[in-house]
Curated annotation (Swiss-Prot):
Span list, region Disordered: 29-48, 87-140
Subunit structure: Interacts with SOX2 and FGFR1.
Species of provenance: Homo sapiens
Domain notes: The 9aaTAD motif is a transactivation domain present in a large number of yeast and animal transcription factors.
Biased amino acid composition, Gly residues: 96-107, 117-134
Keyword set includes RNA-binding: no
Keywords: Developmental protein, Disease variant, DNA-binding, Intellectual disability, Nucleus, Transcription, Transcription regulation
DNA-binding stretch(es), residue numbering of this chain: 139-207
Disease: Panhypopituitarism X-linked: Affected individuals have absent infundibulum, anterior pituitary hypoplasia, and ectopic posterior pituitary.
Protein's UniProt name: Transcription factor SOX-3
């Protein structure tokens, strides 16, 4: 011990307790060079009780070599043992070496140590309020009758089927428990009641706080499940297809309401007149001899100039049909039936083939016996199909419009400049087709 006393008796002896206390208070490792520049005048202000609050930092010099003349042998060995076992923890054996601050620090550290030792076996008696709260969170609920019964059955089934998953075992145990009678369940129910009574005695302040986070997420996902099933790329197409299907299958939809106005003049005149207005070829409805129509590739088979609004159609119907005809003109299918026009308006934004298929389905479903009034066809069909379509269209038009015109015959209708004169352009347009449709009545009109 002689060299140690010589080393610690000079200028270094009053400097060591301050360095050690500073490292204890801050609980951070300090490099050795910062310890060397510590002024020696701060030694008398430090108290020895600070040595028991926290362990010296790992980077600090070894205390037994510098505190041999200050601490007794048992305290020095206990300090060294604590440093080896828990470098950053709290020494619990040096309670008798400090001043008034030592008992409090030692008591807290011993309580924490006791709480850590007893954390697996329930609440500890020497733990503080915080320790008791953490132990209370670890308290499990008392087992019910099924858990009491399934505890032994699960072990047996796991031994019999080592490769079976725990979830499958739980399913089988639940099914077996439901098959048991009340007499067979009675002992397990009594055992569960006894366990609950014991649990209430041990933890009188226990309150069950369930964690419902996962279940709430499942509830939220349940409402958003239909939209989540669709791939992200097909969302818009599926929405448009659903709208088209709803418009086609609805009993009182846009197509059916448009069909009520079909009997007035036999044609959805709004489509043609609106296309003319959009293209800058608008003309007043009272003109009896219109100029020749412009050449339009999608509708080159129909005379748009000869088909105007009927004076018998109410203004509300005209404005209503304008909306549907606008969507039909935008999608490129102006020569289809009113219900097909409505379906095309619902299917706006899809591919042309998809819109044509939806329009054809809507026309077939909503027109009923009037299904062949105007056929939905591509813009350039074969000549045979075109002539057949023209014969059907002209025959149906003449037959339906003659119901609402004053009596006078076809010649008077063709020659008069009044409402019947709008058929003049239609006659001129379809004369080249060589179709004799006078006096023909289609079967679909009956």
């Amino acid at each position: 011990m002689r060299p140690v006393r010589e080393n610690s008796s000079g200028a270094r002896s009053p400097r060591v307790p301050a360095d050690l206390a500073r490292s204890i208070l801050i609980s951070l490792p300090f490099p050795p060079d910062s310890l060397a520049h510590r002024p020696p005048s701060s030694a008398p202000t430090e108290s020895q009780g600070l040595f028991t609050v926290a362990a010296p930092a790992p980077g600090a010099p070894s205390p037994p070599a510098t505190l041999a003349h200050l601490l007794p042998a048992p305290a020095m060995y206990s300090l060294l043992e604590t440093e080896l076992k828990n470098p950053v923890g709290t020494p619990t054996q040096a309670a008798g070496t400090g001043g008034p601050a030592a008992p409090g620090g030692a008591g807290k550290s011993s309580a924490n140590a006791a709480g850590g030792a007893n954390s697996g076996g329930g609440s500890s008696g020497g733990a503080s309020g915080g320790g008791g709260g953490t132990d209370q969170d670890r308290v499990k609920r008392p087992m019910n009758a099924f858990m009491v019964w399934s505890r032994g059955q699960r072990r047996k089934m796991a031994l019999e089927n080592p490769k079976m998953h725990n979830s499958e075992i739980s399913k089988r145990l639940g099914a077996d428990w439901k098959l048991l009678t009340d007499a067979e369940k009675r002992p397990f129910i009594d055992e569960a009641k006894r366990l609950r009574a014991v649990h209430m005695k041990e933890y009188p302040d226990y309150k069950y706080r369930p964690r419902r986070k996962t279940k709430t997420l499942l509830k939220k996902d349940k409402y958003s499940l239909p939209s989540g099933l669709l791939p992200p790329g097909a969302a818009a197409a599926a929405a448009a297809a659903a709208a088209a299907a709803a418009a086609a299958s609805s009993p009182v939809g846009v197509g059916q309401r448009l069909d009520t106005y079909t009997h007035v003049n036999g044609w959805a005149n709004g489509a043609y007149s609106l296309v003319q207005e959009q293209l800058g070829y608008a003309q007043p409805p009272s003109m009896s001899s219109p100029p020749p129509p412009p050449a339009l590739p999608p509708m080159h088979r129909y005379d748009m100039a000869g088909l105007q609004y009927s004076p018998m159609m109410p203004p509300g119907a005209q404005s209503y049909m304008n909306v549907a005809a606008a969507a039909a003109a935008a999608s490129g299918y102006g020569g289809m039936a009113p219900s097909a026009t409505a379906a095309a308006a619902a299917a706006y934004g899809q591919q042309p083939a998809t819109a044509a298929a939806a329009a054809a389905a809507a026309a077939a479903m909503s027109l009923g016996p009037m299904g062949s009034v105007v056929k939905s066809e591509p813009s350039s069909p074969p000549p045979a199909i075109a002539s057949h379509s023209q014969r059907a269209c002209l025959g149906d038009l003449r037959d339906m419009i003659s119901m609402y015109l004053p009596p006078g015959g076809d010649a008077a209708d063709a020659a008069s400049p009044l409402p019947g004169g709008r058929l003049h352009g239609v006659h001129q347009h379809y004369q080249g087709a060589g179709t004799a449709v006078n006096g023909t009545v289609p079967l679909t009109h009956i």
